[in-house]
């Protein structure tokens, strides 16, 4: 997925079919163990919902070095680490605590 624009915590993702979807950034973090940056996002239309579909991606410079791409996390151990980071920011009811 390519990360098109980042405007005040808002990100437009473009899928392989050219469809755009607006997401809100929850937070980003860096991992020294993996040497990568990560981002948690959720669909903007879910902002006021009781629950949201949080997605996590690796932030990587794109091949043209003119922007960034969001890359799926495919390694199970890496995914466990990312999930653990997210869980430190969720309360017992699954609500985000900043």
Swiss-Prot record:
Source taxon at top rank: Bacteria
InterPro entries linked to this entry: UPF0473
The name this protein goes by in its record: UPF0473 protein Lreu_0536
The family this protein is said to belong to: Belongs to the UPF0473 family.
